[in-house]
């Protein structure tokens, strides 16, 4: 779906000639994607709709994950014959024709474990494989074992996995890191991109693009060999995110690519489908019905695209923070996504150079530099003093401060003076007793106040350290770790999200109950423990008093971006 081009001529920035060569070469690879498995709402048609609307299961994900016991077409034919017969029992029909997902076994940790020991003991508990995937299973097979987040999440998730892998590396499980990188490379080769998760109903979208950072992490252990090995898959993923760019005119958008009126190229989140999400079917239908002034398909697309962002859901995407039906994800250009795209371009340049292709390395550097200028020009709110998303409807940078504003610092794309202002804004507006707030808005959505999420704590900590802001970075790590420790001391588990307005409380809001496990919290906790404690005296629990910043080992970045006025 393209947006119309402006009616009057616009000045266009000079786009590097290499960009069209890069995308032309890679688009061929993207077009080789085979026929993909159909999601259950398509396979089962009216049966899927009727089961979900009947609310047979408390969690809509249950039936989306159910495995048909025979050909779905035959099951659907039987359903059509039986559904209007006297005494027909839909629940019985489902029980006969489907194998429902099993409840995960409750993990009871040994008594007396430290926080670190608990996490190290969880890695095998959270490890899964898809060796025995059934023919009509929505679960997509992967060649190697993988670590799932935990709780209701029985599959691997894209951006979760990077932060889980940080912890695996910290625990010395480089074999598991290598397995997960291989799995994601397999998905790119098989489907043309990394889906939201390894389910057929997730194939229409991706998630925040961390694959290049995963390869870079693996290269810490394997050297440049990892960069060279996975260069083709990184290029294919880049082609997926930039698909359609070669035909865009100024002021247009196509799928995940946005070309602004001066020719600046940026990215947005997008889902190729505009129907209710199978895993949240009833909720999405209700959201669309609650706003009759918008086409339902438009709302469905924006709900799905918010899921692609990983922030499902947040006031960040909404016009009215208390009405989910006002979200418009596809008309917002996210600062975190474009920071990750900048990082992908930088890693592609490094990998190309390692592979001996200096010309291609220079082309990726040119693309990264152009994107960096775009971030500085369009995603810095000078009046507020922080990075923010760009609004395609108002043609202005938005005013809301969110934890996503730390991503330019995380990838070393921020100008030094702006990083300093971000440190002040973070400490003033987002830092809470239990860690970093996701936003300052209390909307009831899970990616808003008072919730704090492990990946955003790490992005902020690492980003601030990159620019020498070690005190604020330590404050974030210390506050969040204290929250994690207090919750663990009371409940003997780590959870998906935390209430950062206090310490020792799991977060609330969202479409499902609080989940424990939990992959990315485990990973970030291990990284932060090793950050705040000296290498000579590693800690297995969070110290009782705040450490000094000298234990933080990351050196400040000397890089300064060149802001475009």
UniProtKB/Swiss-Prot annotation:
Listed name of the protein: Periplasmic trehalase
**Which gene is this protein's source?**
treA
Q: Which GO terms describe its biological process?
A: cellular hyperosmotic response; trehalose catabolic process
Q: Any idea where this protein resides?
A: Periplasm
Q: Which UniProt keywords apply?
A: Glycosidase, Hydrolase, Periplasm, Signal
Please give one Gene Ontology molecular function term for this protein: alpha,alpha-trehalase activity
- Cite the record's Polar residues compositional bias ranges: 548-565
- Record's keyword annotation contains Hydrolase: yes
Give the UniProt family note.
Belongs to the glycosyl hydrolase 37 family.
Gene3D superfamilies, sorted: 1.50.10.10
Q: What is its EC number?
A: 3.2.1.28
NCBIfam families in UniProt: PRK13270.1, PRK13271.1
Subunit note:
Monomer.
Q: Which GO terms describe its cellular component?
A: periplasmic space
Q: Name one Pfam family in it.
A: Trehalase
Binding residues annotated for substrate, in chain numbering:
152, 159-160, 196, 205-207, 277-279, 310, 511
Q: Where is the active site?
A: 312 (proton donor/acceptor), 496 (proton donor/acceptor)
Please name the InterPro entries in this protein's record. Answer: 6-hairpin_glycosidase_sf, 6hp_glycosidase-like_sf, Glyco_hydro_37, Glyco_hydro_37_CS, Trehalase_periplasmic
Secretion signal span: 1-30
Residues covered by region (Disordered): 538-565
Q: Which reaction does it catalyse?
A: alpha,alpha-trehalose + H2O = alpha-D-glucose + beta-D-glucose
Q: Which PROSITE patterns match?
A: TREHALASE_1, TREHALASE_2
Role according to the record:
Provides the cells with the ability to utilize trehalose at high osmolarity by splitting it into glucose molecules that can subsequently be taken up by the phosphotransferase-mediated uptake system.
Record-linked SUPFAM superfamilies: Six-hairpin glycosidases
Q: Reply yes or no: does the keyword Signal apply.
A: yes
């Amino acid at each position: 779906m393209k947006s119309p081009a402006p009616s009057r001529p616009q000045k266009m920035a000079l786009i590097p000639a290499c960009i069209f060569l890069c995308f032309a070469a890679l688009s061929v690879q993207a077009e080789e994607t085979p026929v993909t498995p159909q999601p259950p709402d398509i396979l089962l048609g009216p049966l899927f709709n009727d089961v979900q609307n009947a609310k047979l299961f408390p969690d809509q994900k249950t039936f989306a994950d159910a495995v048909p016991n025979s050909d779905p077409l035959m099951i659907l034919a039987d359903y059509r014959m039986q559904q209007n017969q006297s005494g027909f029992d839909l629940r019985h029909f489902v029980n006969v024709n489907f194998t429902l997902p099993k409840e995960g076994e409750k993990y009871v940790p040994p008594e007396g474990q430290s926080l670190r020991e608990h996490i190290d003991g969880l890695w095998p508990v959270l490890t899964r494989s898809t060796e025995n995937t059934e023919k009509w299973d929505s679960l997509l097979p992967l060649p190697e074992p993988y670590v799932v987040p935990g709780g209701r999440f029985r599959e691997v998730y894209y951006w979760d996995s990077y932060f889980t892998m940080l912890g695996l590396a910290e625990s010395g499980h480089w074999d598991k890191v290598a397995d997960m990188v291989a799995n994601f490379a397999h998905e790119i080769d098989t489907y043309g991109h990394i889906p939201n998760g390894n389910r057929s109903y997730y194939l229409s979208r991706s998630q925040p693009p961390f694959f290049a950072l995963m390869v870079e992490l693996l290269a810490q252990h394997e050297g440049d060999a990892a960069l060279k090995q996975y260069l083709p898959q990184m290029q294919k993923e880049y082609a997926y995110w930039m698909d359609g760019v070669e035909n865009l005119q100024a002021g247009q958008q196509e799928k995940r690519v946005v070309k602004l009126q001066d020719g600046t190229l940026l990215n947005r989140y997008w889902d190729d489908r505009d129907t209710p999400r199978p895993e949240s079917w009833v909720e999405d239908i209700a959201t669309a019905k609650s706003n009759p002034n918008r086409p339902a398909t438009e709302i469905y697309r924006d709900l799905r695209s918010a899921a692609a962002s990983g922030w499902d859901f947040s006031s960040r995407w909404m016009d009215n923070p208390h009405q989910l039906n006002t979200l418009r994800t596809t008309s917002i250009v996210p600062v975190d996504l474009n920071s990750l795209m900048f990082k992908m371009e930088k890693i592609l340049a490094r990998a190309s150079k390692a592979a001996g292709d200096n010309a291609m390395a220079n082309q990726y550097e040119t693309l990264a530099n152009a994107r960096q200028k775009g971030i500085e020009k369009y995603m810095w709110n000078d009046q507020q003093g922080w990075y923010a998303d760009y609004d395609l409807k108002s043609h202005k940078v938005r005013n809301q401060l969110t934890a996503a504003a730390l991503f330019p610092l995380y990838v070393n794309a921020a100008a030094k003076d702006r990083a300093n202002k971000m440190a002040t804004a973070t400490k003033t507006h987002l830092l809470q007793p239990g860690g970093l707030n996701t936003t300052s808005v209390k909307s009831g959505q899970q990616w808003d106040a008072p919730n704090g999420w492990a990946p955003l704590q790490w992005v902020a900590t690492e980003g601030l350290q990159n620019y020498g802001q070690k005190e604020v970075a330590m404050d974030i790590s210390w506050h969040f770790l204290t929250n994690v420790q207090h919750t663990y001391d009371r409940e003997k588990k780590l959870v998906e999200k935390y209430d950062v307005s206090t310490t020792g409380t799991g977060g609330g809001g969202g479409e499902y109950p609080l989940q424990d496990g939990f992959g990315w919290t485990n990973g970030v906790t291990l990284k932060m423990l090793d950050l705040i404690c000296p290498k000579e005296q590693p800690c297995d629990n969070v110290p009782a008093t705040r450490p000094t910043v000298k234990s933080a080992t990351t050196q400040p970045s000397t890089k300064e971006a060149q802001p475009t006025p």
